[in-house]
């Protein structure tokens, strides 16, 4: 006789199951310590007391050789820039104090003062996850969260290690960034890969899924893709990351573009449509899609933005990173991915100089967008956020003793992109990218602090 179980009972029993197991196998050592320690996600057996609705942690001694053999080191993200923190774009996520490049400690003035929160309670974490703005949007039910809570714990622990966060004492913004943003998006990406793979038969060469990330500059898309790429690698899925920046014209090509468009500020520097090597884009995307077997390798283009006094040039091919098949996914990010050409009178009303950029944009669908199978579109409420985000980054760089643009230079830099944002974002947000399947587009609204929010 079948027994019906209510949703709440299923969640309760699932959490009880996960809280009576030992969270040890395949969990990384916490990033804030070089020695194995007992913390909220590692080396604890959690028991559930029916008489008391709370979880009790019991420490397990992790000194056995078996445990040591399971705790292999994981690479951490240790590059420091801007205000001396590993979170370059996501300032609200870093520790209140950071180490500058000369070894001195200073307060990060860009950070809000937030209280730390203890995430040791799995039941509290479950409730926090379910309160996020993305869970319903991507079809993650409370039942599914309960059934996969061990994955959420694992992914959270891995991201804490990557970004050198103390997983015992995450601030509320840190906790939200991981469990309301990065991990839900990663789970959505996993679902998209599973859907993609299901369309092929056993034994077929399955091309990697291409996920496009369209998001304005400074909103944190590079950090998001960095986190997703890391999680894919820790889950044994091979991934490749590329950016529209990788396909900018060479310095010589940029000079020719300026010469052909005298007086057009939108094409004076790299950035807008027309300043990319679309042939290289096609060659790269098609070559990556063929990395379906072990042993197949290729180098992926990269761009050196600091060359020629900041005008930039393609990096020497000897420095390009190498990727190896079989690839499961390609993460392709860019500020103008998915932009569609508009009628000439519409773009001229925004900025007359945008007309030639709009004409150039006609070639971009066949070079970029048609290769993208699924989309993450990060939406902002006001394009002027880009100016404030860029200004924050440059101020932080100057405070750290690095070369940064002045406020006036930031204004000039961003002004070359704002016409495109004003012209193309409304259509992108209303209709989605050209040729995209609405069921495979994840639209994420973020606020000025770069956190996901519920759309109005």
Swiss-Prot record:
Entry's induction text: Isoform 1: Expressed in the light. Isoform 3: Expressed in the dark.
Q: Which keywords label this protein?
A: ATP-binding, Chloroplast, Cytoplasm, Glycolate pathway, Kinase, Nucleotide-binding, Photorespiration, Plastid, Transferase, Transit peptide
State any GO BP term from the record: oxidative photosynthetic carbon pathway
Entry superkingdom = Eukaryota
Q: Which reaction does it catalyse?
A: (R)-glycerate + ATP = (2R)-3-phosphoglycerate + ADP + H(+)
Keyword Nucleotide-binding set for record: yes
Q: What is its EC number?
A: 2.7.1.31
For this record, an example GO cellular component is: chloroplast envelope
Is the keyword Nucleotide-binding in the record? yes
Per the entry, what span does the transit peptide take up?
1-63
Example GO molecular function term?
Answer: glycerate kinase activity
Quote the record's binding site residues for ATP: 215-222
Q: In which pathway does it act?
A: Photosynthesis; photorespiration; 3-phospho-D-glycerate from glycine: step 4/4
The record's annotation in Pfam families points to:
PRK
User: Function of this protein?
Assistant: Catalyzes the concluding reaction of the photorespiratory C2 cycle, an indispensable ancillary metabolic pathway to the photosynthetic C3 cycle that enables land plants to grow in an oxygen-containing atmosphere.
Q: Which PANTHER family match?
A: URIDINE KINASE
Family recorded in the similarity comment: Belongs to the GLYK kinase family.
What is the official name of this protein in its record? D-glycerate 3-kinase, chloroplastic
Organism, by scientific name, is Arabidopsis thaliana
Show the taxonomic lineage.
Eukaryota, Viridiplantae, Streptophyta, Embryophyta, Tracheophyta
């Amino acid at each position: 006789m079948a027994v019906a179980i209510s949703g709440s009972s299923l969640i309760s029993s699932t959490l009880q199951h996960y809280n009576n197991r030992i969270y040890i196998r395949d969990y990384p050592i916490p990033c804030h310590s070089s020695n194995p320690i007992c913390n909220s996600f590692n080396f604890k057996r959690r028991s559930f007391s029916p008489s008391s609705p709370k979880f009790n942690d019991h420490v397990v001694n992790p000194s056995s050789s078996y445990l040591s053999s399971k705790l292999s080191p994981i690479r951490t993200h240790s590059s420091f820039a801007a205000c001396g923190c590993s979170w370059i774009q996501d300032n609200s996520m870093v520790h209140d104090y950071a180490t500058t490049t000369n070894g001195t400690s200073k307060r990060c003035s860009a950070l809000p003062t937030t209280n730390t929160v203890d995430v040791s309670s799995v039941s509290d974490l479950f409730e926090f996850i379910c309160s996020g703005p993305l869970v319903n949007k991507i079809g993650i039910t409370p039942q599914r969260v309960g059934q996969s809570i061990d994955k959420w714990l694992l992914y959270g622990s891995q991201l804490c290690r990557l970004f050198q966060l103390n997983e015992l004492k995450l601030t509320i913004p840190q906790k939200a960034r991981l469990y309301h943003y990065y991990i839900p998006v990663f789970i959505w990406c996993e679902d998209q890969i599973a859907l993609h793979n299901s369309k092929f038969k056993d034994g077929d060469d399955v091309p990697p899924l291409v996920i496009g990330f369209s998001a304005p500059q400074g909103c944190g898309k590079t950090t998001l893709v960095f986190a997703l790429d890391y999680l894919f690698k820790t889950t044994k899925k091979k991934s490749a990351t590329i950016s529209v920046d990788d396909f900018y014209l060479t310095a010589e090509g940029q000079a020719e573009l300026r010469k052909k468009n005298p007086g057009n500020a939108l094409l004076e520097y790299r950035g807008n449509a027309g300043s990319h090597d679309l042939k290289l884009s096609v060659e790269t995307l098609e070559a990556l899609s063929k990395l379906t077997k072990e042993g197949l390798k290729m180098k992926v283009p990269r761009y050196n933005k600091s060359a020629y006094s900041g005008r930039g040039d393609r990096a020497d091919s000897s420095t390009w990173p190498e990727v190896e098949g079989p690839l499961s996914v390609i993460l392709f990010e860019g500020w103008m991915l998915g932009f569609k050409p508009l009628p000439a009178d519409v773009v001229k009303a925004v900025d007359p100089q945008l007309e030639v950029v709009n004409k150039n944009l006609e070639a971009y669908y066949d070079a970029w967008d048609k290769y993208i199978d699924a989309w993450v579109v990060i939406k902002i409420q006001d394009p002027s956020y880009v100016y404030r985000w860029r200004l924050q980054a440059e101020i932080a760089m100057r405070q750290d003793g690095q070369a940064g643009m002045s406020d006036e230079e930031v204004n000039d830099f961003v002004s070359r992109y704002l016409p495109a944002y004003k012209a193309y974002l409304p259509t992108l947000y209303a209709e989605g990218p050209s040729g995209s399947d609405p069921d495979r587009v994840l639209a994420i609204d973020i606020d000025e602090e770069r956190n996901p929010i519920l759309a109005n």
